[in-house]
């Protein structure tokens, strides 16, 4: 801690999930610490030091600005000194003085054999653990500095914005949009009851498995939508201005009423691919599904209109109307055109992409902000007695407690805003589901699986849907010889070129899985178990424990009913049917 660095920013990549676990306990002993935490993630830490706390550093997580690994960022920004590799799992308390052969590839994290061989060739039995650890850490710092330096320069040249004023990418994207592209302050900052009401119907992308396996000899085509959310932001009318509350069926008075309507929803029984999502209660917690049946929920008016065309019926009970306007077209068009001017390996392409995809996140951010205070143990009992019901977490750090609690000034008045507009976010996700609905219940398209922005089908797609260079159009990602879909984010693909694509949500390393594993999982109650490492973070003890755990992989009925044949093999799925209790 040196005075000349007063008011400097210290960037640490992935600080919240790694470095701060070791640092925070010691920073508390060296000065005054004020963390800013949102959704259990440390955004930044204000650190004051000196005799009277007159000097300040701010520790920031650069991952929140540049959402990628440091290795990939070095490639994207073409820095002079790129991040290296290191055998993290080789190090233990008994071999700190090790000198010898380069440790086996199994001790390195997520590297290719070619990269390992290239690294190993630099040594001749003289690999020194201590020296290489220091070199690795120093190079991490140098490469991160070069990435941030380039990023800062490019953002300022483009938009005259100082990156160091914004702790996250969505906050930077919003600042750029607000100063360069927003013509007037017409985005409503919704709070309190209105925000809670609209959030009732706020769901993300629709992910469903319909057919678990393709017949032998039948190819499955995997298509992605080109920049789904930005495409809908570019074309969609957004809810702006001040909302107006109404009761009854507003469409009887104003057939063009626009906003969010709380409705009784009746889905057609014969629909193959339901297109309206809702939150339901299960014995395993809350799930988001696309059911049939009848229930009540909040819905964006444009999504309601689209669903009517698919046979849904709605009885509007109450809601909020808004003015409407296309507010994002200039922002998205500028960034998309900028991106198209540069090759994918150019950092400008990367910057345009991340800014285009990050603005949406700002509007949908959870506005239930909590305050975090570092309270000395001597003063904590008084604080606890006064605010016990509002304390959500307490972590011991030496002579202090890191206390998370609801903001004191908001306890009596829940009308806080943080530049959050759930109406905008809800409209964007709704428009995106509307866009994807054109591929569902289409007699010309046989669907196996759909994700937020992708479809998997064995049908020939009309060429009018396809254009890899146009926002919102489909682009063919893969042609698959074999495909097995088991659940949301759980599938196996073998492409025509022989490449295996395996997706298992929650499993860090799926490389040991193969086609036969997924084939066997089609059998009822079959289970595949794999060992993987779980990182257990402990702020109080400044430790990260890596524990080997068994990860169980199986078919789930979280989203749809599973249909088995007489041999107990999974062959299809069916819609859940719900009523107003929304329980399955």
What spans do the regions from the language model cover?
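Conserved acidic
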Residues: 1-584
């Amino acid at each position: 801690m040196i005075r000349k660095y007063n008011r400097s920013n210290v960037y640490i990549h992935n600080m919240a999930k790694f470095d701060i676990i070791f640092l925070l306990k010691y920073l508390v002993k060296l000065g005054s610490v004020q963390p800013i935490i949102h959704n259990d993630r440390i955004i930044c830490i204000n650190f004051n030091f000196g005799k009277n706390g007159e000097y300040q550093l701010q520790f920031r997580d650069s991952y929140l600005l540049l959402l990628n690994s440091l290795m990939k960022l070095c490639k994207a920004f073409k820095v002079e000194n790129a991040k290296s590799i290191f055998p993290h799992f080789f190090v233990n308390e008994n071999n700190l003085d090790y000198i010898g052969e380069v440790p086996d590839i199994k001790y390195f994290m997520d590297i290719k054999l070619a990269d390992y061989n290239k690294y190993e060739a630099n040594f001749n039995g003289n690999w020194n653990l201590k020296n290489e650890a220091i070199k690795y850490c120093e190079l991490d710092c140098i490469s991160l500095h070069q990435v941030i330096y380039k990023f800062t320069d490019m953002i300022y040249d483009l938009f005259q914005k100082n990156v160091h004023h914004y702790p996250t990418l969505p906050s930077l994207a919003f600042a750029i949009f607000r100063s360069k592209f927003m013509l007037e302050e017409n985005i409503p900052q919704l709070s309190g009851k209105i925000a809670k009401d609209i959030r009732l119907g706020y769901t993300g992308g629709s992910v469903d498995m319909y057919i678990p396996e393709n017949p032998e000899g039948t190819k499955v085509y995997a298509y992605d939508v080109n920049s789904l959310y930005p495409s809908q932001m570019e074309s969609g009318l957004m809810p702006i201005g001040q909302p107006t509350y109404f009761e009854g069926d507003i469409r009887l008075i104003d057939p063009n009423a626009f906003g969010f309507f709380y409705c009784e929803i009746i889905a057609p029984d014969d629909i193959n691919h339901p297109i309206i999502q809702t939150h339901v209660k299960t014995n395993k917690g809350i799930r988001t599904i696309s059911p049939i049946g009848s229930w009540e929920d909040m819905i964006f008016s444009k999504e309601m209109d689209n669903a009517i065309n698919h046979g849904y019926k709605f009885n509007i009970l109450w809601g909020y109307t808004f003015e409407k306007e296309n507010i994002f077209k200039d922002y998205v068009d500028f960034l998309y055109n900028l991106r198209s001017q540069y090759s994918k390996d150019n950092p400008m392409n990367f910057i345009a992409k991340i800014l285009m995809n990050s603005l949406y996140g700002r509007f949908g951010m959870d506005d239930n902000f909590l305050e975090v205070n570092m309270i000395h143990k001597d003063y904590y009992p008084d604080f606890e007695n006064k605010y016990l019901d509002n304390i959500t977490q307490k972590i011991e750090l030496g002579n202090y407690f890191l206390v998370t609690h609801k903001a004191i000034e908001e306890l009596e008045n829940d009308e806080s805003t943080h530049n959050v507009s759930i109406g905008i976010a809800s409209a964007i996700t709704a428009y995106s589901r509307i866009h994807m609905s054109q591929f569902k219940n289409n007699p010309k398209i046989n669907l196996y699986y759909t994700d937020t922005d992708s479809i998997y089908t064995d049908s020939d797609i009309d060429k009018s849907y396809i254009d890899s260079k146009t926002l919102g159009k489909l682009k063919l990602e893969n042609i698959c010889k074999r495909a097995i879909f088991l659940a949301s984010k759980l599938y196996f693909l073998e492409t025509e070129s022989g490449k295996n694509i395996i997706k298992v949500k929650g499993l860090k390393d799926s490389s040991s899985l193969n086609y036969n594993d997924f084939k066997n999982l089609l059998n009822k109650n079959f289970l595949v178990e794999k060992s993987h490492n779980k990182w257990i973070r402990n702020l109080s003890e400044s430790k990260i424990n890596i524990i080997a755990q068994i990860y169980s992989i199986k078919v789930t009925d979280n989203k749809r009913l599973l249909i088995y044949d007489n041999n107990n093999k999974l062959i299809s799925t069916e819609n859940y049917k719900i009523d107003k209790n929304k329980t399955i």
